[in-house]
Amino acid sequence: MFPLKDDNPTQTKPIVSIALIAICVCIFLYQFSLLHSENTFIIDSLGMKPKELFLNPGLTNYFTIFSSMFLHGGFMHLIGNMLFLWIYGNNIEDAMGHTKFLLFYFVCGLAAALSQALVTPNSDIPMIGASGAVSGVLSSYLLLY
């Protein structure tokens, strides 16, 4: 069962959460408009591959840690992540402030990506999705509320 809302009011408009959701949705719609082979190329190019990260360290492969957070593998993958970000992100953004929240979001995504890379260092399967960053937001919500 998916939650639809929480009962904690906020004092500020969650502009960072809204922007992250809008960016992810726009990128997914772009992915959806592509041919299968083109979408596969995008995921292969911009998804984070642990093996590449360790074998060929460099700016391009480090960039994929962040670019992978905006790609999603399907409609339910996107909806699940964005729903949880919408419900819980607004309270964390309100508590932290916009700039700190954005940094926190990316640090959570970075920590999740590096954790995955350390567990599966030989994997050349692209890791995509905002799940790691959103999990960090959800964890902080559980700690605060």
Q: Which residue ranges define each predicted feature?
A:
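A detector for small-residue-rich transmembrane helices and their helix-helix packing motifs
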Residues: M1-Y145
